[in-house]
A protein has these predicted regions:
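Formylglycine-dependent sulfatase
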Residues: 2-8, 13-15, 21-355
Length: 355
């Protein structure tokens, strides 16, 4: 039986929030809820909080049409514990094992725990999770079989549908997980993952820097190489299932928009956790060079685009006025987080944490 903890579920750890309170088929007593969770986005990284070197028009819309918080706090300074608290309503420091999770960590939130998704599902909502997860998968750490349905996944936590990253973009495995199994699984390239030792014959960033054609590490992040970028942890295989970093935002956002379309006639809850602006920052080419801050600024612009795609979908389907949108970051900003992307050198007076 699931334990119910309501205390923190009503706490909005928000950067900008908009209540868009026309689809006549929807029950207005149950507004849709979209929780947008940015990664490592700072208070000062958005125009609505004073950013000058990057444009965020879609987030600006949320701020101008809704409520902009100027005093809000995350429960932790890193990803895993902050997300744990948000989804469970519990302080992470009360639970062992909620520090920054490896990509092969077992599922930290246990199926018997009552989650935010459970709360919405029990109220008749369709529930979906998209993007960065970083709370473990499978029943036990390092015991996952990535070539079969995972023994524990988001379906056990109240989510009807999920399309997520197992951990973060800088940690293996570099594949999407859809409803508890590797998306676009390639049987010709079975997946193996280790956070202890490399697999024989597999190149690493430390030993084969000549293979890092997309991004090089500034410190750490020198293990397995995927898409010309070295990561934390070791993996083998993946084949066609491996993501391309420049397409992560497109893929996550497209699946989220499809979810909105599929559930436009019923109340839905969406947990939309972007990879942006976490490292490795390798946004799509169409966002490159649009600001003064290099790749980190480009990643902020890409994040804003994702927000805009959700807003556009709601507008087109007449759902905007019956949808509550909450936007937050999991924690404060990180500038140099292990890759040589010139993020610090190109701040040009920008203050990610605000002033």
């Amino acid at each position: 039986m699931k334990k119910r903890h309501y205390g923190m579920l009503s706490l909005a750890l928000t950067s900008c929030l908009a209540v868009h309170a026309e689809n006549k088929n929807q029950n207005t007593d149950k507004p849709n809820v979209i929780f947008i969770y940015a990664d490592d986005l700072g208070y000062g990284d958005l125009e609505c909080y004073g950013a000058k070197n990057v444009q965020t028009p879609n987030v600006n819309r949320l701020a101008s049409e809704g409520i902009r918080f100027i005093n809000a706090h995350a429960t932790a300074a890193t990803s895993t514990p902050s997300r744990y608290s948000m989804l469970t309503g519990e302080y992470a420091w009360r639970k062992p094992g909620t520090d920054v999770a490896a990509g092969n960590a077992g599922m930290i939130i246990r199926p018997e725990q009552y989650t935010m998704a459970d709360m919405f599902k029990s109220s008749g909502y369709a529930t979906g999770a998209f993007g960065k997860w970083h709370l473990g998968l499978g029943d036990k750490t390092a015991q996952q079989d990535w070539n079969a349905p995972l023994s524990a996944s988001l379906g056990d936590l109240g989510f009807d549908y999920s399309y997520i990253m197992a951990a973060t973009a800088d940690r293996v495995p570099c594949v999407f997980i859809e409803n508890g199994q590797v998306a676009n699984y390639d049987p010709s390239a079975p997946i193996e993952v280790s956070y202890i030792k490399n697999f024989p014959g597999e190149p690493t960033g430390k030993d084969n820097p000549e293979l890092l054609y997309n991004l090089k590490p500034s410190h750490g992040h020198d293990m397995s190489i995927v898409n010309g970028i070295s990561r934390i942890g070791y993996m083998k295989g993946g084949g066609k299932a491996l993501w391309k970093d420049e397409n992560i935002a497109d893929s996550i956002t497209a699946h989220a928009v499809d979810f909105i379309k599929q559930h436009k006639d019923e109340p839905f809850f969406m947990y939309f956790a972007t990879n942006d602006v976490h490292v490795p920052r390798f946004p799509h080419n169409r966002f490159r060079g649009k600001n003064k801050m290099g790749l980190r600024g480009d990643a902020i612009a890409q994040f804003d685009w994702s927000v805009g795609q959700l807003l556009e979908a709601l507008d087109k389907m007449g759902l905007t006025q019956n949808t509550l949108i909450i936007l937050s970051s999991d924690n404060g900003p990180v500038v140099d987080d292990g890759y040589d992307d010139k993020a610090e050198e190109l701040l040009n007076g920008h203050e990610p944490a605000g002033n």
